[in-house]
Amino acid sequence: MQCPTCQNTDSRVLESRSADSGKSVRRRRECLNCSFRFTTYERVETMPVSVIKKDGNSELFDKQKLFTGISRACEKTTFTSEAIINFVDGIESQILQDSNKDIKSSQIGELILKSLRKENEVAYIRYASVYRKFNGVKDFISTLESLKGASKNQLASIL
């Protein structure tokens, strides 16, 4: 590892520990030339994943877009900021494990819906309403029916 001060490539590791919930290794190093101490992080390199959009175009997977969409769905629910981050990390891990290089945006959307359905029903309905482009109350009712198995009469009395 190159020293940030003198650019010497000889250093010794003073301390190593797991970081980022086991996803990286933090190493404290000392330059053998100038004795400058610095920290490095070692992570597994992941292959970039391309997302194939509905119109056929592709773009690189963007974790921030995933976070933004899920955060909006989880506003004013019991999801904490930390829980949202962990949820997004889990979705990202599944995407990176399941796909070789390309994944359809529809597959990502369904993966998010499947996971949200288990975690929080309100966030699930909110995400589904945007992802599936609900046009009116009927779309909400049919999704609520599938979520709870309730009859239309029961839902009508609630609404």
Curated annotation (Swiss-Prot):
Q: How is the cofactor bound?
A: Binds 1 zinc ion.
Which organism was this protein described from? Prochlorococcus marinus (strain MIT 9312)
Q: Could you identify this protein by its name?
A: Transcriptional repressor NrdR
Q: Where are the zinc fingers (unnamed)?
A: 3-34
User: What processes does the entry annotate via GO biological process terms?
Assistant: negative regulation of DNA-templated transcription
Sorted alphabetically, which keywords does the UniProt record give?
A: ATP-binding, DNA-binding, Metal-binding, Nucleotide-binding, Repressor, Transcription, Transcription regulation, Zinc, Zinc-finger
User: Biased composition, Polar residues: where in the chain?
Assistant: 1-11
Q: Which HAMAP family match?
A: NrdR
Instruction: Cite the GO molecular-function annotations of the record.
Output: ATP binding; DNA binding; zinc ion binding
Instruction: Write down the InterPro entries for this protein, in alphabetical order.
Output: ATP-cone_dom, NrdR-like_N, RNR_NrdR-like
User: Which segments carry the region annotation Disordered?
Assistant: 1-21
Q: What does this chain do? A: Negatively regulates transcription of bacterial ribonucleotide reductase nrd genes and operons by binding to NrdR-boxes.
Q: Does the keyword Transferase apply?
A: no
Q: List cofactor names only.
A: Zn(2+)
Its family remark reads: Belongs to the NrdR family.
In this protein, which residues make up the domain named ATP-cone? 49-139
